[in-house]
Amino acid sequence: MGFRLITQLKGMSVLLVLFPTLLLVMLTGAQRACPKNCRCDGKIVYCESHAFADIPENISGGSQGLSLRFNSIQKLKSNQFAGLNQLIWLYLDHNYISSVDEDAFQGIRRLKELILSSNKITYLHNKTFHPVPNLRNLDLSYNKLQTLQSEQFKGLRKLIILHLRSNSLKTVPIRVFQDCRNLDFLDLGYNRLRSLSRNAFAGLLKLKELHLEHNQFSKINFAHFPRLFNLRSIYLQWNRIRSVSQGLTWTWSSLHTLDLSGNDIQAIEPGTFKCLPNLQKLNLDSNKLTNVSQETVNAWISLISITLSGNMWECSRSICPLFYWLKNFKGNKESTMICAGPKHIQGEKVSDAVETYNICSDVQVVNTERSHLAPQTPQKPPFFPKPTIFKSDAIPATLEAVSPSPGFQIPGTDHEYEHVSFHKIIAGSVALFLSVAMILLVIYVSWKRYPASMKQLQQHSLMKRRRKKARESERQMNSPLQEYYVDYKPTNSETMDISVNGSGPCTYTISGSRECEMPHHVKPLPYYSYDQPVIGYCQAHQPLHINKAYEAVSIEQDDSPSLELGRDHSFIATIARSAAPAIYLERITN
């Protein structure tokens, strides 16, 4: 009985172990199921470019990323993604979505990134994005949205990036971004916005970059951007802006970049830039500006880059404040400013026209202090030219005046430049002294620590110089000496001297060196026929033998007809050899 009970318990234990294992395997297999025509990479599902008209089935509930880009989805139904509660990002761009149900995003509360760009969405319900309060990135660009609901983005307190580019928006509702307190980037470019309400951007305390380019604004008042303390860049290019004004009662110290290019700005109100003390980059090209006032350029105290080309500059006395400001400006600037008037200087560069026609010759420059100090920021450059004020001839003589000239400098800045130069000289001298001291210290330590090595180096250098000198002397000794040659032209008298006396003068010459005379002893008895030279000169290393023996005849044969006394004895023999120290003569007998 006990044995059977033990056996049954063992069987049950095996089943209890196997059943959960099989169940776990089945659940795992179900979770890893990948829809047809899709690609699954772990917890990421890619169902792209397969003309899906609806959301594919069998998508794992544990998926964290789903891409449905480049398909044919036309509508997002209610609870469309309810089973994907682990989803973190969802890409639905480049479809044909025109309708989005109010509850389409129910059940995916953890969603952080939603891309709906490049669709045909014309309307979004007020509560469309309420089920996804954790969104960080929302892209609605390149759709056909005409309006935004007043509570369109309510509850999106964690939203950082919002794209509304290339829609058909005409207005921005008041306080529509009130809850987007962490928004960092907002793009409203390429819409049909004509105006902005005073509180359109209320609540965007952390906004850093705002795009409003390619809209239909006709005027801009900085009062429309209330207390955007962290805004660094605002882009307003290619609108229809005719005037720029400011109604701020506070200093907008955070703004560094302002792009107003491609508008219809004809004039800038004096004092417009006083509220922007830290403005560093300003684009005013492709407008209709004719001049810039002295008060305006005085407010450009922190600029490091400016573009002014493509305007209708009037090259008269009104251009002088801007001309002198640009002349002293040390940052990046556009140099292609062209005169639009008067007619006789149209098409000429502003700088050339002013200097050629002495337009500003009677304008006096007075150095003034800044009316206010800009708050210090990390991005502010350490030094910029001080603004100047231009006066007419009516300025009292008590003021210090400087007439414009090519070498014009602002008074009061020389000391600053001298101070900087003096410090640079001191720093350079100290650096040079320390470098020399370090080199000498290294040499001294090496000499003290390794004296034998230093001596060896010196001896090695000395031996090397000696070897070099020895090689040079050897090269000089072994250089090829000049060739020897013998030019022997015996006359009849010399021949007779040799025949009778047994000796005669013989001269050989070392070209370019010296001459010597050596006697050649010949026995008087034999006679020689001069088919070959009588003597051989200048042997080098080996004796030079006359190849043919001399033909000697006895005195008894003196009357023989074979003796030809009329032979020509002016035969010339020249022998050339390499130089050799030993030279001797040898006669070969028959």
UniProtKB/Swiss-Prot annotation:
Cellular component terms per the entry's GO annotation: AMPA glutamate receptor complex; extracellular matrix; extracellular space; GABA-ergic synapse; glutamatergic synapse; photoreceptor ribbon synapse; postsynaptic density membrane; postsynaptic membrane
Pfam families, alphabetized: LRR_8 (PF13855)
GO biological process: AMPA glutamate receptor clustering; neurotransmitter-gated ion channel clustering; positive regulation of synapse assembly; regulation of presynaptic membrane organization; regulation of synapse assembly; synapse organization
Boundaries of every LRRNT domain copy: 31-59
Repeat (LRR) residue spans along the chain: 60-83, 84-107, 108-131, 132-155, 157-179, 180-203, 205-227, 228-251, 252-275, 276-299
Glycan attachment residues as annotated in the record: 58, 126, 291
GO MF annotation list: heparan sulfate proteoglycan binding
Protein's job: May play a role in the development and maintenance of the nervous system. Exhibits strong synaptogenic activity, restricted to excitatory presynaptic differentiation.
Name this polypeptide is given: Leucine-rich repeat transmembrane neuronal protein 4
Organism of origin: Rattus norvegicus (Rat)
